[in-house]
Amino acid sequence: VKWPNDLVLGGRKLGGILVEGRMQHALLQRLVVGVGINLVAPPVDVPHAVSWSEWETPPTADRVRRALVDRLVLGLRTVLELPSPDLWGFVSQRYTKILWGLGAPQELSGRTSPEKKHTVLLVGPTEDGRMRVLRDGVPDVLHQGEWVWSYP
């Protein structure tokens, strides 16, 4: 996973994850999870995209869908059984293990100033889902949507 939600294969974007939740009185009321995977062809408007078929014969969309739902249900059952104080530690530890590019230099630009490039070193996620980095050698915290990430 490339922060915050890209699925990466061979250093290129294979798909993405979108999670939206609704809280009420500090409790999660609703959660919607969307996953998109380029099985056969990458989108033409994403130059750094890749499709599963470029690596091997992809499974059918139904098979992928069933596997994703099975894993998601298993993961949600595990997480929902945890006491609230332990939840972030559990999720963050697993997210950090699969985070692409952690500890390696990454190039990004501001969404409002794409011509200005920065080199960051990914340090790890914060408790609220932002990313701790060293940006041009200075500690910083990045917010989702403010930055555009380069691909190699």
Give names to the regions the model predicted.
Residues 9-152:
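Long, positively charged amphipathic alpha-helical accessory segments at protein N-termini or as interdomain linkers
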Residues 1-3:
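General beta-strand structural signal in soluble alpha/beta enzymes
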